[in-house]
Each structure stands twice: as C-alpha cells, then as structure tokens.
C-alpha cells in the first residue's frame, strides 16, 4: 500500500478514471448489441449514428484505439447496409 500522499491520491484518481471508462465502454457495448439485434433498417440507421458517435468519443478520450473504433464502425456499417429495407 502506498504511503505518500500523492500516491494515495493517484490511486483514488485511477480508480475513478477506471470506473468512468468502464461505464462508457459498457454503455457503448450495450448499444452495439442493440444495433446488431435490430432487424428494421430505419431503426438500425438511427442506432448506427448514435453508436458511431459513441465509438468516436471513446477513441477521442483514448479509451479505445482510433483504429479499433474505425474497424468497429466499418463492420457495423456493413451490417446496417446488408439489412433489408
């Protein structure tokens, strides 16, 4: 266990950051699952816009790598485009 005041503060800050990042990742994952489960193209398009923004935000905040976000967006776009109108 850390003894220095700054180290204790760093532990608290890291924990808070971890919880915030985990919450954002979990929320995004839930929306991705919801998008993959959708069968109506109009609904999927709306959800895709939202999920795309969420992935971009995660990449911007360095929670996930920008290429990871780009790959996920690409796969989701293919999925949405394959849906029957």
Curated annotation (Swiss-Prot):
Ranges in a coiled coil: none
A GO molecular-function annotation: structural constituent of ribosome
InterPro entries: Ribosomal_bS20 (IPR002583), Ribosomal_bS20_sf (IPR036510)
Any single biological process term in GO: translation
Keywords, ordered alphabetically: Ribonucleoprotein, Ribosomal protein, RNA-binding, rRNA-binding
GO annotations of cellular component type: cytosol; small ribosomal subunit
PANTHER family xref list: 30S RIBOSOMAL PROTEIN S20, SMALL RIBOSOMAL SUBUNIT PROTEIN BS20C
Family: Belongs to the bacterial ribosomal protein bS20 family.
Described function: Binds directly to 16S ribosomal RNA.
Protein name: Small ribosomal subunit protein bS20
């Amino acid at each position: 266990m850390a003894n220095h005041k700054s180290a204790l503060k760093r532990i608290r800050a890291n924990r808070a950051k971890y919880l915030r990042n985990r919450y954002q990742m979990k929320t995004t994952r839930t929306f991705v699952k919801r998008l993959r489960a959708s069968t109506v193209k109009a609904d999927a398009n709306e959800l895709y816009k939202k999920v795309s923004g969420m992935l971009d935000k995660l990449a911007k905040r360095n929670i996930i790598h920008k290429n990871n976000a780009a790959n996920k967006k690409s796969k989701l776009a293919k999925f949405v485009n394959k849906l029957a109108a």
